[in-house]
């Protein structure tokens, strides 16, 4: 991805293109593109040394025509307003694609969290939460974990808002530990959503999952459970990559053996019975389905030209560059876009929020049942519209998301 790439300009152009495909008027397109609120905050933090350091944070609510804002909080040294704005728009589209009653939001602080002590991280989190407190809440905007944030960070945010408001507010964030209002089933929800979309695509292509060869790039929070889920459904995961390298087992990787090995070695490399694959050759491993489940921008034009898989399912956020997507389209390789494929995570957040508001927690079986239903319905709607619009699945998903936002905006009208 080039240094002059602007994520906000890119996302805006995608929404504009979807609007033109739907023949929306320019006024509606501009309303959908323009963020509703951009909050920039100063985040002073007293460091362990006694000095006070200044950081900058943001919370952006892109669109709330369909419900409260929803989107993660990231702590990273590269965070900027254009990135957060683009991600908030992505969340608007994603929530509309899976048809849950949320709009899109995103937040972040420009900081390298690896340089902070645990105490400094807590102070940073609480001060940031205090600064954005006027614009977040169960009925307005519900943050969640993202890059370098986790259930502990969500716990600190929830506690800070609870102290400010004088009553318990578990629904102010999702992705919390079970002990304070988290939900059974949240862990692995993104991976389950990816699996459901993969199976749905195979069904619509009249292909059986049995013995479909899959390669998975990434063995973290998404990739690890994904390998097991795909294997349980009859597919053969023949190659897996992580940051330290990649392995290939033509007859299929034993997911339990891989999990044990990874727990001991900290990498997939070296699994007994596997061949080591150079990272630049990973996408060329003979396969039927390729699933990027780690970084963005990995399926470049060059990779797209050499990838052997006949299907791509995007478990990561933005794993395919514009040039790579164009090549895959030219080659006739269907791609289930990230805005649909990895939406299981935000659906899980919606379920957690609903349980917090009800004060009634579901059993894991009910959680999974409702997640599968939601993802199946979302995929089916995209597939049907894909046939009607005559464009690829990525453009169709964007169009469906924009169409649903436009409908809500039109119905609500303009105040005053």
Residue ranges and their predicted role:
Residues 176, 182-286:
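Glycine-rich phosphate/diphosphate-binding loop of Rossmann-like nucleotide-binding domains
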């Amino acid at each position: 991805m080039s240094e002059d790439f602007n994520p906000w300009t890119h996302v805006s152009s995608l929404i504009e293109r979807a609007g033109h495909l739907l023949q929306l008027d320019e006024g509606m397109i501009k309303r959908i593109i323009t963020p509703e609120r951009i909050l920039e905050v100063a985040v002073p933090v007293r460091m362990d040394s006694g000095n006070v350091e200044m950081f900058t944070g943001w919370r952006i609510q892109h669109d709330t025509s369909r419900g409260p804002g929803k989107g993660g909080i990231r702590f990273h040294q590269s965070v900027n307003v254009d990135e957060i704005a683009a991600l908030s728009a992505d969340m608007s589209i994603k929530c509309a694609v899976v048809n849950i009653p949320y709009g899109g939001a995103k937040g972040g602080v420009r900081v390298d969290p690896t340089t902070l002590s645990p105490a400094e991280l807590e102070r940073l989190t609480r001060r940031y939460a205090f600064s954005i407190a006027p614009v977040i809440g169960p009925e307005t905007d519900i943050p969640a974990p993202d890059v370098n944030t986790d259930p502990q960070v969500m716990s600190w945010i929830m506690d800070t808002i609870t102290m400010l408001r004088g009553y318990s507010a578990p629904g102010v964030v999702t992705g919390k530990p079970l002990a304070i209002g988290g939900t059974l089933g949240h862990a692995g929800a993104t991976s389950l959503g990816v699996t459901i979309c993969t199976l749905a695509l195979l069904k619509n292509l009249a292909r059986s999952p049995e013995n479909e060869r899959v390669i998975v790039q990434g063995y973290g929070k998404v990739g690890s459970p994904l390998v097991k889920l795909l294997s349980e459904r009859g597919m053969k995961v023949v190659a897996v990559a992580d940051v330290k390298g990649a392995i290939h087992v033509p007859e299929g990787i034993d997911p339990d053996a891989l999990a044990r090995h990874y727990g001991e070695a900290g990498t997939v490399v070296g699994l007994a019975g596997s061949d080591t694959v150079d990272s630049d050759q990973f996408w060329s491993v003979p396969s039927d389905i390729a699933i990027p489940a780690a970084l963005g921008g990995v399926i470049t034009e060059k990779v797209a030209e050499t990838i052997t898989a006949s299907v791509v399912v995007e478990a990561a956020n933005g794993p395919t560059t514009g040039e790579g997507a164009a090549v895959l389209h030219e080659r006739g390789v269907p791609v289930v876009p990230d805005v649909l494929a990895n939406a299981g995570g935000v659906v899980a957040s919606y379920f957690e929020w609903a349980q917090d508001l009800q004060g009634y927690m579901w059993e894991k079986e009910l959680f999974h049942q409702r997640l599968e239903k939601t993802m199946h319905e979302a995929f089916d709607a995209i597939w049907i519209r894909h046939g009607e619009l005559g464009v690829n699945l990525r453009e169709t998903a964007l169009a469906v998301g924009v169409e649903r936002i436009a409908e809500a905006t039109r119905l609500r009208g303009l105040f005053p």
